[in-house]
Amino acid sequence: MSKTKDQRTAKTLERTWDTLNHLLFISSCLYKLNLKSIAQITLSILAMIISTSLIIAAIIFIASANHKVTLTTAIIQDATSQIKNTTQTYLTQNTQLGISFSNLSETTSQPTTTPALTTPSAKSTPQSTTVKTKNTTTTQIQPSKPTTKQRQKKPPNKPNNDFHFEVFNFVPCSICSNNPTCWAICKRIPNKKPGKKTTTKPTKKPTIKTTKKDLKPQTTKPKEVLTTKPTEKPTINTTRTNIRTTLLTTNTTGNPEYTSQKETLHSTSPEGNPSPSQVYTTSEYPSQPPSPSNTTN
């Protein structure tokens, strides 16, 4: 019941805290507006009331938290007092540990604890604790827990005869040592271990080496072009061989109407034919007299 009450009060306090914060915000926003003096005074009074209520709520929170803390400390103190009352007032002397008991007054006596002797092995050693009473101090011997972890034992090696015998539904004979009933029930398992699987590796295909041909372009020599030199034209030697002067008379009476004297220049070609292109008249050469040998009557 107390827990539910505390939860309810906490929820109500949270709600009031939130509402008061909202009211403060709203009042501050309204105060910033240019209202009349009366409205501003009322808003300021509301803000003061809300701020005081917030302070009260915070005090309630702190008080409830302190109450919870005091409750827990009181419970712990009650538990410790009950443990002290239930403990034995005195114990017999233990000769193995060599513990001596002495009655001491409350002013001089202080609770002392002897630490437990811990060995590297996993064996547990007793640990002594002292409890303070009004006039005497008593010790309790409590077995201490082993500090070191126990090593896990390795499983025993299985015999070679039974290979994974827990799978089978029958009892292998390797287990039966001297039990006749076991020998009557058991069955012998052959000593054949599963052989190693022969793994055939895939044969690699022979790699055909392809030699790259030289893809160089074949250099063909250009055909020799016959260069014909221009033949020299034969030089025509023109020589004056025969100069014929002809004197033509139209009538035998001695009245020359037209006299003409032709002078032909014959050029000697390689064939020997005279070239008729060169014809000279006597009018062109007036200074040369006609020769008597070439005249015809």
UniProtKB/Swiss-Prot annotation:
User: One Pfam family this chain carries?
Assistant: Glycoprotein_G
What ranges does the record list as Basic residues composition bias? Answer: 190-207
Residue positions with a glycan:
70, 72, 80, 85-87, 92, 100, 103, 105, 113, 119, 135, 137-139, 144, 147, 199, 203, 219, 231, 235, 237, 251, 253, 269, 275, 282-283, 287, 294
| Cytoplasmic side stretches | 1-37
Q: Can you tell which superkingdom this protein's organism belongs to?
A: Viruses
Chain segments carrying region Disordered: 103-161, 190-297
Comp. bias intervals (Basic and acidic residues): 211-232
Region of interest (Binding to host heparan sulfate), ranges? 187-198
What are the Polar residues biased-composition ranges? 254-285
Q: What is this protein called?
A: Major surface glycoprotein G
Species, as recorded: Human respiratory syncytial virus A (strain rsb5857)
- Name of the encoding gene: G
